[in-house]
A protein has these predicted regions:
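N-terminal metal-binding scaffold of metallo-dependent hydrolase/deaminase domains
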Residues: 1-36
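Divalent metal-coordination and catalytic microenvironments
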Residues: 8, 21, 26, 45, ...
C-alpha cells in the first residue's frame, strides 16, 4: 500500500522545507509528484523529521520495573518521535559482564518497540571504584561505557578505563561528581542554599572531574562524553577541549536551561542530581547550546 503525505514541512539538508512524503508498505519510498498512491493524507503543515535519537535514557529494567520498564520507556520514546535510545546501566544486575548484559538484551528483544542500544558499566557493579569490566568482551553489544549516577573517583582507574575503551573504539560517557566535595549537600551551594540554611553541592564537585577527565582523554585518545553538564565551568572546559580538537562532547537537560536555584523558592520539589544551579550557570548553558559547545 502506498500513502502520500502532503502539506508537510520536511527536514532535509539541514533545514525545513515544504514537501511531501511517500510511504510504501510501511517504509519511505522515493516520492515523485506523479506517482500513484492508494491514499493521500494532508499533514496541515506539521513538521516531519527523521527518527530522533536519545543518548541518555533510564529504562531501569532489569531490577527496578516499578520505576520504568523497557516496554513503557520505549513506548514513550516512540510517542515522542524517538526511534533509537541508549539505555544507561543503573540496573540490577548491572551490565558489567556478558551474562549480566544478556539479561537486559533479552528483555530488549522481547519488549522494546524502538531500537535500544545499551551502555555497559565502567566498573564491576557500577560502583565508580574497584575493578574495571572486561571492555573487549562487552564492546560488541554496547554503544559505550558509563557508570552514570556515580563518578569514577580514581584518576588512575579512569585513565585505564579510557585506554581500554579507546582500544575497542567505544566512548567513555561520564557522570562527573567528586564524592569528597559533596559534603552531604542536596541543592546547589548558592544564594538560596545559604539564605535558608541548607547543605549545598558546590559547582566544583562537577567541573573538577570534567577537567580531570578531559586531560585524561587528551592523554589516551579516548572519545569522551560528559553527561548532564550543569555548571558554567564545565561548559567552558568542553569549549576549550573542542577548540584543541579533542573528541569531547557533552549534554545537558531541559530543566537546567529553564530553571535555576532561585526557583526553589516557589517549588521545593525541584531536587535532582546534579542540582539546579545559579542563574549565571543557566545562562552559560544557553550560550553553550547557541554556539554548539553543548551537543545534546
Amino acid at each position: 500500500m502506498k500513502t502520500r503525505y502532503v502539506n508537510a514541512l520536511c527536514y532535509r539538508g539541514g533545514e525545513f522545507a515544504a514537501g511531501s512524503l511517500l510511504v510504501e508498505d510501511g517504509r519511505f519510498a522515493a516520492d515523485a509528484p506523479a506517482a500513484a498512491a492508494d491514499r493521500t493524507v494532508d499533514l496541515g503543515g506539521l513538521h516531519v523529521v527523521p527518527g530522533l535519537v536519545d543518548v541518555h535514557v533510564h529504562l531501569r529494567e532489569p531490577g527496578f520495573p516499578h520505576k520504568e520498564t523497557i516496554a513503557t520507556g520505549t513506548a514513550a520514546a516512540a510517542r515522542g518521535g524517538y526511534t533509537t535510545v541508549c539505555s544507561m546501566p543503573n540496573l540490577d544486575p548491572a551490565p558489567d559482564t556478558p551474562d549480566h548484559l544478556r539479561v537486559q538484551t533479552d528483555l530488549i528483544r522481547r519488549d522494546a518497540v524502538v531500537r535500544v542500544v545499551p551502555y555497559a558499566s565502567i566498573t564491576l557493579g557500577q560502583r565508580g571504584c574497584g575493578e574495571l569490566v572486561d571492555f573487549a568482551a562487552l564492546a560488541p553489544e554496547v554503544v559505550g561505557f558509563s557508570d552514570d549516577g556515580r563518578g569514577v573517583q580514581s584518576a588512575e582507574l579512569m585513565e585505564e578505563a579510557m585506554r581500554r575503551a579507546a582500544a575497542v573504539g567505544k566512548p567513555i560517557v561520564a557522570h562527573c561528581e567528586v564524592d569528597c566535595l559533596l559534603r552531604g549537600g542536596y541543592i546547589h551551594d548558592g544564594g538560596y542554599c545559604r539564605t535558608h540554611g541548607h547543605k549545598g553541592i558546590c559547582s566544583e564537585s562537577e567541573w573538577r572531574q570534567v577537567e580531570r577527565d578531559i586531560a585524561l582523554a587528551e592523554k589516551t585518545g579516548c572519545q569522551y562524553h560528559v553527561c548532564h553538564v550543569s555548571t558554567r565551568e564545565s561548559v567552558e572546559l568542553v569549549r576549550q577541549a573542542k577548540a584543541r580538537g579533542l573528541r569531547v562532547s557533552c549534554e545537558t537537560a531541559p530543566h537546567y536551561l529553564l530553571l535555576c536555584d532561585e526557583d526553589l523558592q516557589e517549588e521545593g520539589r525541584f531536587k535532582m542530581n546534579p542540582p539546579l544551579r545559579s542563574r549565571a550557570d543557566r545562562d552559560a548553558l544557553l550560550a553553550g547550546i547557541a554556539d554548539g559547545t553543548i551537543d545534546v
